[in-house]
Each structure stands twice: as C-alpha cells, then as structure tokens.
A protein has these predicted regions:
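Mature, function-bearing regions of proteins
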Residues: 1-152, 156-332
Length: 332
C-alpha cells in the first residue's frame, strides 16, 4: 500500500515522547527577540490567511517546513545578488540554527499569526532589508529590498514549502497547489514582492525569467555541508538530518540541480519512501506548541482542526513537479 493511501487521523503519543517533541518544537522556533510571539492572542483575531486554506495545512507539518526551507535557501543562493545578501548579512555561517529559527518563526507568523501581529513583524523585516546593500563578487551592486530579488526569494520559499508537502507528506491536486500560491500573494505584497506567483503557471514563468541569472557557487556547497553536519535538529532527530537535507536537494528542480552541480546528492527510492513515512506521521501529530494548533485555538477551533479528513486520493501524482525551464546553453 502506498503511504499516501493510508487514511490519516490525528495522534497523540505516550507522554514522555509527546513531551520531548513538544520541547523540540518550541526550541526550533525559539528565535531570541521574536520568541515571545503569542499565537494564541488576540483571541478571535484572524490571520493573513484563512484557517480553511491550503497554506494552513501545509505549514503545520514540521518535516516539510524544514525540508522545504532548505530547498528554498538552495534556490535562493543560486542567484548571485540574493546569495551575496544572504551570506554577507545573515548568520548562516556563524550561527545557522539561530538564522533558521528566525526564518521559520517569520514564516509561521506570516501564515498563523494574528493580523495585528503579522503586519508589524513584516514591516520590521522590510525595514531591515532597507539597510542591506552591497556588491556581488563580480562587482554588481545589490539592495535587498529590490522587488526583483524579493520576487525570487518569495517564489523559492513558496515552491519549497508546498513542494515538500506535496512530495513527502500528502499529494495535493493542481487546484490545491494553485490555491496555495494565490493565498500567499497578500503577504508577499506586504514583504515587497511585486510579481509573486499566483499559480504554478506564474511560478514557471518566474523561473524561466530568472534561469539565465542562476549559477553554480561554492557557497551552496558550504551551506549544504553546514545543514548536513551542523547541530541543527534536536538530538533524537540527528540520525535523519542528513537524509532530510538530501531530500531537500532532491526537491530542487532537476535543471537547477544540474546548474548547481548537485545531482550527486539525490535520494535512493527507498530513502524517499522513508522520508514520506516520516512526513505522513508528522502530519498526524498534534503538538500543543505548534503555532498551527495555537492559531486554531485562538480562533476557537478544535486543536485537531487541521489534522482530520485530510486523506488524499491515490490518483493524485506524488512525483516531482519539473517545470520545463531549459538550462543555459553552456550548462547543457
């Protein structure tokens, strides 16, 4: 039986294991000055995205959030201006865990936070971007708040998260994936993106328009090495950390893996099934510390609101979405 054909139902584990996972979930989102964000308040206040959205289903899963986030960064780092901004103005090298926590928390606030909490946070992020500028190794100037760069960063994140869920957790129909992209547009505009994809077709066009600027870089390999061997995940999850990072690489569009020289990191078929089983299990695990669960409580919805009646028809493809974007001539 395919893992996606199993009827899903929310689960709560025995207390010691459940408690360990609750602590791990809290630590993964402990981001220093932003860690005081309360997803339970203000009571009754809606988020930027509705509770019945595809986005709320996708972002509740910690495995696809981690895998998709790594995929997004790999794709971001392929663009030289974004790469310079990320590598020179963030703590990925010196403190990758803190950087990942801040990024993950920002994503959670954007999707699940009350509007009165999310909008000021996004405004702070934009002010920070206003101060980020420099030159690439080739001497080209960049500013982090350039719409073209923000469009790329947003698109890679949107692709990474939804594709990780679709591939490793539960297949989404084309309609659901298109809905997911459309749901994110209002938040993308707040972040400063001007042409955020509203559908997979829009994403394909954006990838085509950016492909000739993407290039191989040793920084991508440095980032992957940090993610594979650094103390990123809680101790009890370290045995699968390398597997999950390679799953993220495997999720990167095939043509881009070729440009970045990453084809050697691909998963074996049995490894892909292992990730899918872990992802399916994570999608049933109701953690009180998960912002998705807390946001449901804020809206007076059941804690397991996002965890019931989510089985997918087995006829939906579980494979990669490989957009027909051609590599540059010298990469063929």
């Amino acid at each position: 039986m395919n893992v996606f054909e199993v009827v899903t139902a929310p689960i709560i584990l025995p207390w010691p294991l459940q408690n360990s996972l609750e602590i791990a979930a809290r630590l993964l989102l402990h981001a220093g000055d932003q860690s005081s964000i309360d997803f339970l308040r203000p009571a009754g206040e809606r988020a930027l995205v509705s509770a019945d959205s595809v986005s709320w289903r996708v972002f509740k899963n910690p495995l696809s959030l981690f895998v998709g986030g790594v995929t997004a960064v790999i794709m971001e780092l392929a663009e030289p201006h974004v790469r310079a901004g990320v590598w020179e103005h963030t703590t990925f090298r010196s403190d990758p865990l803190r950087r990942l926590r801040r990024t993950g928390l920002a994503a959670m606030v954007t999707v699940y936070g009350a509007r009165s909490v999310a909008e000021p946070m996004i405004a702070r992020v934009r002010r920070m971007h206003d101060m980020v500028a420099g030159t690439t190794l080739s001497g080209e100037p960049y500013r982090a708040n350039e719409p073209e760069l923000l469009n790329w960063v947003y698109a890679t994140a949107a692709y990474g998260f939804v594709q990780a869920y679709h591939t490793y957790v539960q297949p989404l129909s084309s309609l659901e994936r298109n809905s997911y992209y459309a749901e994110g547009v209002p938040a993308a505009v707040l972040y400063g993106a001007t042409t955020a994809p509203r559908s997979e077709t829009d994403l394909e066009l954006l990838l085509k328009g950016t492909a000739n600027r993407l290039e191989r870089s040793d920084i991508v390999f440095e980032f992957i090495a940090i993610m594979r061997s650094g103390p990123i995940l809680p101790l009890f999850l370290r045995p699968v950390q390398d597997l999950l990072v390679r799953a993220a690489i495997d999720l990167t569009p095939r043509w881009l893996r070729t440009i970045l020289a990453l084809n050697g990191y691909r998963l074996h078929a049995w490894e892909r099934e292992v990730v899918r089983h872990i992802g399916a299990l994570a999608d049933r695990l109701v953690l009180g510390s998960n912002p998705a669960v807390q946001a449901c409580r804020r809206l007076r919805l059941p804690s397991d609101y996002l965890y019931v009646n989510r089985s997918a028809p087995s006829s939906i493809s579980t494979g990669h979405v490989n957009f027909p974007v051609e590599p540059r001539a010298h990469d063929r």
